[in-house]
Amino acid sequence: DECCAIPFCAKIFPGRCP
């Protein structure tokens, strides 16, 4: 998901990135 491409987003929502 596009969140995973954004470092701060991936840190806030770690479960979204495989």
Swiss-Prot record:
Disulfide bonds join C3-C9, C4-C17. Expressed by the venom duct. Keywords: Disulfide bond, Secreted, Toxin. It is found in: Secreted. Its main location: secreted. One of its GO terms (cellular component) is extracellular region. GO terms for molecular function: toxin activity. The keyword Disulfide bond applies. The cysteine framework is I (CC-C-C). Alpha4/7 pattern. This is Conotoxin pc1A.
